[in-house]
Amino acid sequence: RGVVFALAHIRGGSDLGRQWYLDGKLMKKKNTFFDFIACADHLVKDKYGALDRLAIEGVSAGGLLIGAVLNERPDLCKVAHLAVPFVDVINTMLDESLPLTVQEYLEWGNPNEKEAGHYMLEYSPYDNIGRKDYPAILVTTSLNDSQVLFHEPTKYVARLRAMKTDSNPLLLKCNMDAGHGGASGRYESLREQAYEYAVLLEQLGIGR
């Protein structure tokens, strides 16, 4: 159908070495978002696609990336998929009873510390939803997810529905049996992925 698939090797990942990872964590986390936006703009500039024909996707912490990018540049794409997304950064990182919170201080910072808390608040997807137009968005979550609890993406969608000023689709799909990794059965996993691709392709106008 003429789809080009691109992977963005952005800071915060270790694709280009240890320093590349360090330059996208803690008080440098925003570099991750800047790099992703730069990658998308590069694809358009070099005519691999156009903003109104671009789909973006991120999983877990990558869902945070997509949520932050949508707040910063809602014009960046036609449709976005956030899978089991970590989008309520402040509330999650303030709750030390959650299984990953304390160990994740090394990645994101401790919001109880003033400087780190202010920085994290500046990019937290949930806290920065604006009263503006957003592209079509699909959010997927799982009822038994122990890493990103299902209420987090659910409240994100609820707030987005209340705030956004467009009429583009905003879909929330919860797998009632799965955990953080999604459906585990061979065919169920394929059906889940097919649904997600179908939504993205439909919004790009090449669904059928």
In which residue ranges do the predicted regions lie?
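Active-site-proximal cap/loop segments of hydrolase catalytic domains
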Residues: 1, 7-208
